[in-house]
Regions:
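Chalcogenol-based redox active-site neighborhoods
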Residues: 1-164
Length: 164
């Protein structure tokens, strides 16, 4: 288990972020309620922007920031993943003009948060994701991870972009 803080209070996750070289396979739900698997992204680098909810300020900022950066990334998909219902994700993207990243939900696939080690097991956000970044190579293997130490802080966007 890993530990971060939520408003300065220590909280724990179900596990650790995957080690470099680990193959990540997943199925998630798109905004139209269809399913998509990691196989759909093979051949591309994939940034997994994992966060608690689109309805929090920092999470919304991370989506906007990655959306702006994604327009200049070659052969790279940016997936913004939370437990939000796809309807909430679609509403946010529509209102914000988000077009360069995909928002995906694991509300039907709780195994995603187990595989990535990101589910909070205690605290006020219990059941939601810890703010983290996982970069996958074209074969779906982990090449970079970041577990943000304080949930209310943004991830290091430049660090993951540099790893591309």
């Amino acid at each position: 288990m890993a530990q971060v803080t939520l408003g300065g209070t220590p909280v724990n996750t179900v596990g650790e972020l995957p080690a470099k070289g680990t193959q990540i396979d997943f199925t998630l739900t798109k905004n139209d309620l269809s399913e998509i698997s990691s196989d759909a992204y093979r051949g591309k680098k994939v940034i997994l922007n994992i966060f608690p909810s689109v309805d929090t300020g920092v999470c919304a900022t991370s989506i906007r920031t990655f959306n702006a950066k994604a327009s200049s990334l070659e052969n790279t998909a940016v997936l913004c993943i939370s437990k939000d219902l796809p309807f909430a994700q679609a509403r946010f993207c529509g209102a914000e003009g988000i077009e360069n990243v995909e928002t995906l939900s694991d509300f039907r696939h709780p195994e995603f948060s187990e595989t990535t080690g990101t589910r909070f097991i205690d605290g006020g956000f219990e059941g939601l994701h810890a703010r983290s970044i996982i970069l996958l190579d074209e074969d779906g293997k982990v090449v970079y991870t970041e577990l943000v130490p304080e949930v209310g802080e943004e991830p290091n966007y430049d660090a993951v972009i540099t790893e591309l």
